[in-house]
């Protein structure tokens, strides 16, 4: 560092004096101007220094709380957060795709089931329906078509044959009810009224589901309800069992009595009244008087009782 030393020079002094002459004052003025112009300026040099401290992180050796981020790229936090958000989005998208595909398959299967269930092309006794198991279908066909050995001329009891023939004839209208689509019957009944009952709709769906569940069992063991509220199968089984036992004993009179027993059991009080010889005259008198029999009307149930019976599946005769 060089230090410049400046020697001080003497500066002229300004003296003022009063004199009567102007020459002296002017000369002094000139002298002062020359002396002031000949003076040199002072040079000054100054240096400033500042201390900046450097931060040194502690060593990670032996310190488990310091993460070594030297090998990690910049923006690691943003990469981790973006990856987690992307995984969540992909999981939601995958769940949506799976649920949509499963609901689509379920809808297609339900549509195929309804189209095959309610179509009239492949409903010949539900023989071509894929929803009916083959053992039930074979048993149903075996029960519908009676073998010729049961109606062969070798049978001695003609009444048994007549009962079996009537059994087959009575099965035809019952089977035709299964052939008819159920949805059309419900829609025709709904056209008669503009009132829509939610309770009736729930009851209809419940009965329809029960019918779907019980249709193979009904087809496997068909039960034909006659006008006397007696099963024809029980009638035929009673006749066949009684006739077989009577034929083994060789007593033909007991056969006729056994045949008459179901008729007595199935006969209603009105039929007993009509079949009795004492009631012939009363029946003729009633017809001549214009059928004066008055049936006592039943008291209509209350709305709450009607809804309870409807939900329980009980049908009331009007």
Curated annotation (Swiss-Prot):
Highest taxon of the lineage: Eukaryota
Protein topology in the membrane: Single-pass membrane protein
Residue ranges, compositional bias (Polar residues): 276-285
Entry keyword set: Isopeptide bond, Membrane, Phosphoprotein, Transmembrane, Transmembrane helix, Ubl conjugation
Any single Gene Ontology cellular-component annotation: cellular bud neck
Inducing or repressing factors: Expression is regulated by the cell integrity signaling pathway and by pheromone.
Keyword Nucleotide-binding: no
InterPro entries: PRM (IPR051009)
Skewed-composition ranges (Low complexity): 238-247
Keyword Glycosyltransferase: no
Residues bearing PTM Phosphoserine: 129, 279, 282, 288
Placement of covalent cross-link Glycyl lysine isopeptide (Lys-Gly) (interchain with G-Cter in ubiquitin): 314
Annotated Basic and acidic residues bias: 250-261, 309-318
Compartment(s): Membrane
Region described as Disordered: 238-318
Transmembrane segments: 75-98
Disulphide linkage map: none
Family (UniProt): Belongs to the PRM5 family.
The protein, known as: Pheromone-regulated membrane protein 5
Organism: Saccharomyces cerevisiae (strain ATCC 204508 / S288c) (Baker's yeast)
Native organism taxonomy: Eukaryota, Fungi, Dikarya, Ascomycota, Saccharomycotina
Gene giving rise to this polypeptide: PRM5
């Amino acid at each position: 560092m060089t230090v410049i030393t400046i020697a001080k020079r003497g500066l002229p002094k300004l003296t003022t004096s009063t004199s009567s002459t102007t020459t002296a004052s002017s000369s002094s003025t000139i002298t002062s101007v020359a002396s002031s112009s000949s003076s040199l300026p002072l040079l000054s040099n100054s240096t400033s220094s500042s201390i900046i401290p450097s931060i040194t992180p502690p060593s990670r050796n032996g310190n488990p709380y310091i993460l070594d981020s030297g090998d990690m790229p910049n923006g690691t936090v943003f990469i981790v957060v973006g990856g987690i958000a992307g995984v969540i989005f992909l999981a939601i998208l995958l769940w949506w795709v799976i649920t949509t595909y499963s609901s689509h398959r379920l809808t297609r299967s339900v549509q195929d089931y309804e189209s095959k269930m309610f179509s009239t092309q492949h409903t010949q006794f539900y023989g071509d329906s894929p929803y009916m198991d083959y053992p039930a279908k074979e048993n149903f066909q075996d029960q519908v078509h009676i073998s010729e050995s049961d109606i062969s001329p070798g049978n001695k009891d003609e009444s048994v044959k007549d009962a079996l023939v009537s059994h087959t004839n009575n099965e035809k209208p019952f089977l035709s009810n299964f052939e008819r689509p159920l949805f059309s019957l419900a829609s025709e009944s709904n056209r008669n009224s503009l009132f829509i009952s939610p309770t009736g709709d729930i009851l209809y769906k419940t009965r329809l589901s029960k019918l779907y569940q019980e249709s193979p069992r009904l087809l496997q063991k068909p039960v034909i309800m006659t006008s006397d509220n007696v099963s024809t199968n029980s009638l035929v089984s009673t006749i066949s069992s009684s006739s077989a036992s009577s034929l083994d004993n060789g007593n033909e009179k007991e056969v006729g009595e056994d045949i008459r027993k179901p008729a007595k059991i199935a006969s209603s009080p009105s039929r007993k009244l009509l079949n009795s010889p004492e009631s012939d005259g009363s029946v003729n008198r009633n017809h001549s008087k214009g059928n004066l029999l008055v049936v006592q009307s039943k008291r209509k149930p209350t709305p709450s009782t009607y809804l309870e019976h409807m939900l329980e599946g009980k049908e009331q005769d009007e």
